[in-house]
Amino acid sequence: MIIRELKGIDEMVDQITVLNELYPDLNQEEYAADLAEMLPHNYGQVAVFEEDECLGISGFWIGRKLWCGKYLELDNIVVCSKHRSKGVGKLIFDYLHNKAKENGCTMIALDSYTTNYKAHKMFYNEGFAPRGFHFINILDDTGVRG
C-alpha cells in the first residue's frame, strides 16, 4: 500500500467511488464544484492505493483558530468496506499526524456523527478524545449530506 496526496480537482474526482460509500448520491459535477470552492481555502486530500485501486481517502484542512492556534482537521475519512481492518485507516492517520507536525499544528481535530461507534473506536485508538460538542443550526438542508 502507498499513500499520497491527491493534487487538483481531476485527480480528486477520479476517486469519487470511495466517497460514494459515504455519500451515495454525490455525483462528479457536484463534487468538482465543491472542490473548486474548497481547494483555495487550504483543503487537501490524501489517498491510499494498492496498485491502481484506491482503498481509502481523507480530506483535510489546515487552519488557525483563536483557542488552539494552527490545527489540521480531518474531513471525511473513508475506507472502502472491502478493505477495512487492513491498516488503511492507520496509514491515513499516521500520514496526517506527520503532516500536522511538519506544518507546526498544535492539534488534529475531526467531527464524527454521534452514532458512528465503529469510527469512535478507531479515533480513541489513534489518541483522539471528545473535547466538546459541534453544534449546528441548519439554515438550508439542500446542501447537507449525511
Question: Which residues fall in each region the model found?
Answer:
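A short helix-loop-beta-strand connector motif used in the catalytic cores of GNAT acetyltransferases and
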Residues: 36-47, 73
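A conserved beta-turn-beta hairpin within the catalytic core of GNAT-like acetyltransferases
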Residues: 63-74, 84, 130-131
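Conserved acetyl-CoA-binding loop-helix of GNAT-fold acetyltransferases
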Residues: 79, 85-98, 125
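Conserved beta-strand in the GNAT
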Residues: 47, 53-62, 78
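Short amphipathic alpha-helix that is part of the acyltransferase structural core
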Residues: 1-29
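Conserved GNAT acetyl-CoA-binding A-motif
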Residues: 100-112
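Conserved active-site alpha-helix within GNAT-family acetyltransferase domains
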Residues: 90, 114-132, 137
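Glycine-rich phosphate/pyrophosphate-binding loop shared by adenosine-nucleotide-utilizing enzymes
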Residues: 1, 52-57, 72
